[in-house]
Amino acid sequence: KDIEANHLELIDLVVVNLYPFKQTIEKKSKWEDAIENIDIGGPSMIRSAAKNHSDVSVLVDPSQYQEFLEERKKGSFNESYKAKLAFEAFQHTADYDAAISKWISKEKNLLSSKYIEAYPLIKTLRYGENPHQKAFWYGLSNIGWNSAEQLQGKELSYNNLLDLESALTTVLEFGYEEKDILTTNKFASVILKHNNPCGASISNSASQAFLNALECDSVSAFGGIVAFNSNVDSATAKNLKDIFLECVVAPSFDEEALEILKIKKNLRILRLSKDKFPKKNQTSTKSIMGGILVQETDDSEDKTENWISVTKKNPSNMMNLDLNFAWKICKHVKSNAIV
């Protein structure tokens, strides 16, 4: 009645861009600045419009605009499209609230009574661990594997991503990129198969590190994943091309090395720089029946000078170096480990 009495038009479209809370906290802003960038009215308008989606269309992200305009040209919006917009709207506000909750929990060291994580869909994978299983990749934009440059090869599979993660976290035990390792002589290479290291080595060059790792178990290395913590040069590439591999990941590749590796058309070549790594103090999760288990990732760094010998014979410095290497690798072996 009020609408009719005042000759008002009905609202049939609501477009809201929320305050940039995530962008604000990424800049490590002050508490007050972050609080100021928590939107109040925006989420209320979005939720109201989404609830009434049969009569109102709601847009929450500029990426939706083009599709909306194309649908508009067709005439009236069908119910399924409006429901899709409502679904995306509620997901958007849920993600926004999750980011706020997680940030406050971290800033004030508060244990959350509910485990809330919101990751956008990166892509639908071809299949999961087996061909009959569906699989999806969710994650943060421009961080981790989502930011890796794939220089060649087919799209990454579910198993590829699991193996790449294990290979990279193992090789990271010895530094990453040239500036980290030139002074320590720890050029490292790890060969991984079925989510377990089957060979690992540190040496005075990436090429020799790979050859040493290959000697650990050249049979299991067939069809495996190789990770380096340093630049891959032509000498290393020549050794890599002699064996069938699924993926190679490194912080950088020489142009000549890429030319050699690209002869193997199906080899997935990935370049991932250190500045794309997530911040430390991340958590890892495991699904169990009826829930999940959450723990801090194991980022501890053991130093040999802190070790205590409990035998009459003390290990030599060389033995300690070997034991330290074995200890680092053992940490990433999934079954009972003998390294």
Each language-model region and where it sits:
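Active-site loop-to-helix "anion-binding N-cap" substructures in soluble metabolic enzymes
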Residues: 1-108, 176, 196, 204, ...
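ATP-dependent carboxylate/acyl-activation modules
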Residues: 12-16, 96-98, 104-339
